Amino acid sequence: MFILNPNEENVILFSMKDFQNLNLIVPIKLGIIGYGFVGQAVAGGFNQASAGKDQIKYYDKFKDSAPLEEVIRDSEFIFVCLPTPMKKNESGIDLSIIDEAMPEITKLTNNTGKIIVIKSTVTPGTTTGYEKLYPNSQFCFNPEFLTEANFLADFMNAERTIVGATNDLVSRRVAVIYRQRFSKTTIFQTDPTTGEAVKYFANAYLSLKVTFANFFYDYCQKIGIKYEEVKKMAAFDHRIGDYHLEVTTLRGFGGKCFPKDLVALMGEMRKARVETSLLKTMWEYNKKIRKIHDWEEIPFAVSKK
């Protein structure tokens, strides 16, 4: 793993003395496959950070967009931002959308030097699996850490950027475009599987934090004390912090990402024969207390299969 920290001298690894100067930004041609909130964050973020210098095209079969062939032909970096829902039976992740798109994408990227940047949340081993299936294309895993409500601001102000690639040149090329445009982010260069695991670690841990808050809220209710007061004083400890400790009227966690990613992680852990009782308890408790299972109605959060 290599870390590019904006507060350290290694920020000049690529022989550019002032990454913050927009005049030094080398414009790139960027294509986006899938234009939901993740794809829109990529487009809006790079457009703003480059002051409109980057050429950005997107393809989404459900929206008015450029043809896939044109987007890939005219791009150096192809960001794949396709949905990866949970299976309807909650056995794990459904990668069929991205799996079915990859043959068409790689047919146009083979032996071109173009880099396929996977933004979609995929289970550990997926990117290296694509590398084996499509050896003439170049891949990188670059997860998003966005909230749907504030996706553009989250993208623009990301604390860390993870670049997961097996090819050192690919890793450096992707790191460069981020460092030139986003001066405050810390860039971690690692392998794809580690990068994929980081995304699941983050979302599973935050789900756990929400679940624990709700557990403790129930306890406070039973013994007649105010959870808000307990939370305020406990969260004053910087090791705990108050993020994701709010207990809302809906209770638990929902939305598009946390539920599907927890289910995906449980599925992968079962395959690896790793104990999943903690995650299973979290998930069952969350379904019990959550008043509305909103993820069941959100497009592409749950597979129809």
What would you call each of these model-derived segments?
Residues F14-D18, N23-I25, G52, Y130-C140, ...:
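Internal alpha-helical scaffold of NAD(P)-dependent oxidoreductase catalytic cores
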Residues F14-R73, F77:
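NAD(P)+-binding Rossmann beta1-loop-alpha1 motif at the extreme N-terminus of oxidoreductases
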Residues K226-K280, K291-P299, S303:
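C-terminal substrate-binding/catalytic lobe of Rossmann-fold NAD(P)-dependent oxidoreductases
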